[in-house]
Curated annotation (Swiss-Prot):
It comes from Nitrosomonas eutropha (strain DSM 101675 / C91 / Nm57). This is tRNA uridine 5-carboxymethylaminomethyl modification enzyme MnmG. Gene3D superfamilies: FAD/NAD(P)-binding domain, GidA associated domain, C-terminal subdomain, tRNA uridine 5-carboxymethylaminomethyl modification enzyme MnmG/GidA. Its cofactor is FAD. FAD binds at G13, G14, G15, H16, A17, G18, V125, S180, Q370. GO terms for biological process: tRNA methylation; tRNA wobble uridine modification. It is found in: Cytoplasm. Keywords: Cytoplasm, FAD, Flavoprotein, NAD, tRNA processing. Pfam families: GIDA, GIDA_C_1st, SAM_GIDA_C. InterPro entries: FAD/NAD-bd_sf, GIDA_C_N, MnmG, MnmG-rel, MnmG-rel_CS, MnmG_C, MnmG_C_subdom, MnmG_C_subdom_sf. GO terms for cellular component: cytosol. GO terms for molecular function: flavin adenine dinucleotide binding. NAD(+) binds at residues 273-287. Disulfide bonds: none annotated. The lineage of its organism: Bacteria, Pseudomonadati, Pseudomonadota, Betaproteobacteria, Nitrosomonadales.
Length: 641
């Protein structure tokens, strides 16, 4: 019997990073093996049943633009879709979807099993095979060895995973799945800097025991958004609502009383948790002035009664979990189906990675996902795709690729990781990107699909649809530039009827569209204007492109100014809490590090471009006040004289 053991690329781990890595490598023609501990958990959502959100939705769109699976899978599995920040500018609008966990796993597995060049095997990897600091393959728990020219590790929270519930702890990669202990030991023997991080999940609740009568309903958006550029609403399953409730003072008293047995506060948990997804006990302690916190009740699927109570992640004892859940309005008789828990795991300093996500120490070994100190399905999937791409390019002896910070949130993510490192689980926000006005969800394909096609990540069907869209936008922009509206017609535009602007000259449609408040639809409705044949989504992107043109250029100039301020000296012992607008995280980190210059401040993990802008404003105000005071002193001196 012949069983192939020789591959171009081996991917270890079948989560969000691993599935994207394996698909990317196989799409590029590499003979690929995906090894996973359990075939039934491919694409598993280990924590919250959702995809997208602020910054994260942008990453999903970029994955889709590069031919990845996540966006298309959530379009087939999403049971509620919303556009966050819909009242704000296009740059910070973000798509978010609740997922049916089972449908999502099925959508991912369907794509894996249909992908040419890709084999999947259920087996646990215990060892990495090396020859002179070069990866040559892996060995499994059954003693089977597989050779490869590149290996991508996407092991999530499984390396040395230790789960905590109250005073109890046990080895696990997540509840119900064993930790990777031998592989963790093997990696610790290598020339890699290792640390511990922590994440957590809330207890699950049986919806049949929830009283929804007095809870606030949160339906999805109409019209329903889609994630994939090739998606349509006909792919969506039945849509459902989420619900909202709040903790209360009784809840907080129960939590405070249970802290004596909280592994977070007894020192049993050493790993640092995600700042922007704190446990409920962390919220109660850190924000003691708050008398309540929001809890979102999110369905886990269409064929299950389980509910995910987003906002009460906890590692308190099971008894305390029951008490705290039942103290919340609507949950007085709630039955917990699975207890919440925290989990600690190994990660490796991402500053030891190249921008390709290949380790500097071991040739051919790539890391992607939580092993690099990130948190979130979307961050993991984006890294996985990039690692799979670069592993393939390495085998082809081609130059590695990573988008720059002005090309993609993926570029921001990787640059932050490999230059700044992490001190806590890293998640993506739009505020991390200095070029966020041009890194929008709507134009992710315009930024990345051509590159994806050149690498072989994007198939011909997607390429033809994209090329037609791009041509339609450019053709319509040209038409807007050459089409002029004569004087005396502007009064027909509803937006300008109350405007003081003169109507005594002609304007091109392009000029008019750049004005705030004038929509593309309104412009082309003028009887003097030839009608357009482009569809709604293309029209929306065209309008955003035109209106944002000037803002994008100004943002570029601002980034250049920031670079010029690299050597600007910061005052010694500056109390950063006096700088208006800084977040608690930024204030805390700046006070702790006390950087000497703006450049040093900008390179601290977690310090965003927006924070640097606020710092510069603060310094300029201080200099202006000092100059005014000196002038005042000078004038008073002249008066005395």
């Amino acid at each position: 019997m012949h069983f192939s053991r020789d591959f171009d690329i081996i991917v270890v781990g079948g989560g969000h990073a691993g599935t994207e890595a394996a698909l990317a490598a196989a799409r590029m023609g590499q003979k690929t093996l995906l090894l996973t501990q359990n075939l039934d958990t491919l694409g598993q959502m280990s924590c919250n049943p959702s995809i997208g959100g602020i910054g994260k939705g942008h990453l999903v769109k970029e994955i889709d633009a590069l031919g990845g699976a996540m966006a298309a899978a959530i379009d087939e599995a999403g049971i509620q879709f919303r556009t966050l920040n819909s009242s704000k500018g296009p740059a910070v609008r973000a798509t978010r979807a609740q997922a049916d966990r089972v449908l999502y796993r099925q959508a991912i597995r369907k794509r894996l099993e249909a992908q040419p060049n890709l084999l999947i095997l259920q087996s646990t990897v215990d060892d990495l095979l090396l020859l002179d600091d070069k990866i040559t393959g892996v060995a499994t728990h059954l003693g089977i060895t597989f050779s490869a020219r590149a290996v991508v590790l996407t092991v999530g929270t499984f390396l040395g995973g230790l789960a905590h519930v109250g005073d109890r702890n046990f080895q696990a990669g997540r509840a119900g799945d064993p930790a990777s202990i031998r592989l963790a030991h093997r990696l610790r023997e290598m020339n890699l800097s290792v640390g511990r991080l922590k994440t957590g999940t809330p207890p699950r609740i049986d919806a049949r025991t929830i009283d929804f009568q007095f809870l606030r309903e949160q339906p999805g958006d109409e019209p329903i958004p889609t994630f994939s550029f090739l998606g349509n609403t006909a792919q969506h399953p039945r849509q459902v609502s989420c619900w909202m409730t709040r903790t209360n003072e009784k809840t907080h008293e129960i939590i405070r009383a249970g802290l004596d047995h909280s592994p977070l506060y007894t020192g049993k948990i050493e790993g640092i948790g995600p700042r922007y997804c704190p446990s409920i006990e962390d919220k109660v302690v850190r924000f003691s002035d708050r008398d309540s916190h929001t809890v979102f009740l999110e369905p886990e699927g269409l064929e299950t009664s389980e509910i995910y109570p987003n906002g009460i992640s906890t590692s308190l004892s099971f008894e305390v979990q029951v008490e705290l859940v039942r103290s919340i309005a609507g949950l007085e008789n709630a039955h917990i189906t699975r207890p919440g828990y925290a989990i600690e795991y190994d990660y490796f300093d991402p500053r030891a990675l190249k921008r390709s996500l290949e380790t500097k120490a071991i040739d051919g070994l790539f890391f992607a996902g939580q092993i690099n100190g990130t948190t979130g399905y979307e961050e993991a999937a984006a890294q996985g795709l990039l690692a799979g791409l670069n592993a393939s390019l390495k085998i082809k002896e081609q130059e590695s690729w990573c988008p720059s910070r002005d090309e993609a949130y993926l570029g921001v993510l990787v640059d932050d990781l490999v230059t700044r490192g992490v001190t806590e689980p890293y998640r993506m926000f739009t505020s991390r990107a200095e070029f966020r006005l041009q890194l929008r969800e709507d134009n992710a394909d315009m930024r990345l699909t051509e590159a994806g096609h050149q690498f072989g990540l994007v198939d011909e069907k997607r390429w033809q649809i994209f090329a037609a869209k791009r041509e339609a936008i450019e053709t319509e922009k040209a038409r807007l530039r050459r089409t002029w509206v004569p004087a005396g017609v502007l009064h027909k535009l509803q937006t300008l009827q109350t405007s003081d602007q003169s109507d005594d000259r002609s304007y091109s449609l392009y000029e008019l569209l750049r004005r705030p408040g004038i929509s593309y639809t309104e412009l082309v409705s003028l009887s003097e204007v030839e009608s357009s044949m482009i569809d709604g989504r293309i029209a929306q992107q065209l309008e955003i492109d035109v209106k944002y043109e000037g803002y994008v250029e100004r943002q570029r100039q601002e980034v250049v100014r920031h670079t010029q301020h690299e050597t600007m000296v910061l005052p010694k012992n500056l109390d950063y809490s006096t700088v208006r607008g800084l977040s608690n995280e930024v204030t805390q980190k700046l006070n702790q590090h006390q950087p000497e210059t703006i450049g040093q401040a900008a390179r601290i993990s977690g310090i965003t471009p927006a924070a640097i802008s606020l710092l510069l404003v603060h310094l300029k105000r201080g200099m202006a006040r000092q100059a005014a005071k000196q002038e005042e002193t000078h004038e008073s001196g002249k008066t005395v004289a």
